[in-house]
A protein has these predicted regions:
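Hydrophobic faces of well-ordered beta-strands that scaffold small-molecule active sites
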Residues: 4-6, 25-27, 53-57, 104
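A short alpha/beta connector and helix-capping loop motif
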Residues: 12-36
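Active-site beta-loop-alpha junctions enriched in small/polar residues
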Residues: 7-11, 30-32, 58-62, 107
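Short, well-ordered coil/turn segments that N-cap beta-strands
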Residues: 2, 23, 49-51, 96-100
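N-terminal glycine-rich phosphate/adenylate-binding segment common to multiple enzyme folds
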Residues: 90-94, 100-110
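Glycine/small-residue-rich loop that forms an oxyanion/phosphate-binding "nest" at active or ligand-binding sites
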Residues: 63-94
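Single conserved hydrophobic/aromatic residue that forms the stacking wall/gate
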Residues: 112-121
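Acidic (Asp/Glu)-rich catalytic clusters
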Residues: 17-20, 42-52
């Protein structure tokens, strides 16, 4: 089976349209977009549509939508990424669900190729 996957919870409020068409979703967890309310809404819609739930963490950079590498210590970076993932994980858990996957967003997804500390998080 082919997995159809989509980034969601990024402020477009189209999750109810897209979720019935996909198998798994990557939910923005507060770095580049998203907040507790949007994560809750996405988790609820994912559950109704039997969609696997994944975290979509990023640099804490809403101004650039997480698309630019920002100067941040490895400690701050680790803390931010783990906070984002843990936030979504707690919400999913409150509905009896587990995170299926993690898909890095924007600059995090391509800087990991050159920065081993990012990959280790």
């Amino acid at each position: 089976m082919i997995n159809i996957n989509c980034d969601l919870g990024e402020g477009l409020n189209n999750e109810h349209i897209i979720m019935p068409l996909i198998n798994s979703c990557n939910i923005a967890c507060g770095g580049h977009a998203g907040n507790n309310e949007s994560m809750i809404q996405c988790v609820e819609i994912a559950i109704r549509n039997n969609v696997q739930i994944g975290a979509h963490p990023s640099y804490p950079d809403r101004l650039n939508f997480g698309r630019k590498k920002i100067k941040i210590s490895s400690s701050e970076f680790s803390h931010s990424i783990m906070d984002q993932i843990n936030s979504l994980e707690q919400i999913a858990s409150s509905y009896g669900k587990e995170l299926n996957h993690i898909k890095a967003h924007g600059a995090v997804s391509y800087t990991h190729l050159t920065l081993p500390t990012i990959c280790s998080v």
